[in-house]
Each structure stands twice: as structure tokens, then as C-alpha cells.
Amino acid sequence: IAYAKERGVMIIPEIDMPGHSQYFNRTFGCGMASQKGMEILEVCLKEFFKEIPQQDCPYLHIGSDEVKVEDPKGFMSFCEKIVREHNRIPIAWDPGLPPAEGTIGQIWYASIGDKLDQQSYPRRYIDSYMGYLNNSCPMVNTSRYFLHNPCNTESSSDNALGGILCLWNDVNVDDQNKLLPHNGMPEGLLAFAERFWVGGN
């Protein structure tokens, strides 16, 4: 974190809650959204906040996507409350479990992003619906990102916070050193950064 901070880069940790968390079930023998699971989760989060100061990580991504739980609103309220009690701002995937007002949405579905109207979207948001490097051929990414309209708006605003380019290492490679080029990271990053820095249609 200190290394990134010295170079003007903010780290936004993501702790997936409760989606993509099979490791939690295997380790503790219960689901994260169960009563016992939430008690364990609270201890883990408090340790995280104790170890990493607010000034180093003012945001915490709480995940929330691709999962169904018995009480989605209650679970989200539980997570958001702990995050806010430690003076952090929660971020959650959209679509995902229903967030509270004030939680930043990270949009990952093109069908939502393409229809996005920042006047009617109920919260601040981050554009990632065009930013999945593993979602198309690396040869196509450069033109896709360069022609993309960031946040579906001509300029930034209080709601449109920018974009995050996502590198999920889903492309199988025989050598870990090939992950970046096989996912189109170098050329994709250049086009994505240019569009989000300049903005406009």
C-alpha cells in the first residue's frame, strides 16, 4: 500500500461478501451470511481495519455479486454498517445484493451501463461494464475501450467517479508471465486510460 501511495495510486481492497467465498465455508464450516458466519466476518473485518489505517484505504469493496442469500438486505446492512463505523466508504458490485444509500456502485453489466443515466442512477458509480479484459479477444479490446463512452456521460460529475479496468485471470496460460499479454492488458490499459482521462463521446 505504501509503495502504491508513493506513486499516486490508491489501493481499494475487495473482500467478497458473501459471493465468491467458498473458501469461507470450507474454513469455518458455515456460510458467510449465517449468524455464525457474520460473527466471524465481523472479527475478520475489525482486524483488517486495525491493520490498515483509514488514510491508506478510505474505501472497501464488499463484493455482493453473483450470490443468493436468505436475507440480502439484512446482510448488506450488516456489512455496510461495519465499514462505515470504521470511517470507510463501501463499494459494491451492481448488479449484486441491494446496497444502502451512500454505497458506491461498481457497474459490471453492459445492459445496465449502456442504459445508464447518471441523473436517475441512485448512487455514485464506477464504470467497469466495458472494462473486463478477459471478456473478449485481446485484439479487439483496444478499439472497444477507445470507442467507449466513459460512465455513459461526456464529463465526470459528483456521481460518475470514473472506471476500473478488471483483469480476471480466466485465460489459461502455460506460463504465468503470459497472463498480461494473453489478457490484452498492455494495449487495453493504454486505450482505457486515454478514454477515461479525456472523457467525451
Language model segments and positions:
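Active-site-proximal loop/turn and secondary-structure-junction residues that shape catalytic pockets
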Residues: 15-21, 66-68, 96-98, 109-111, ...
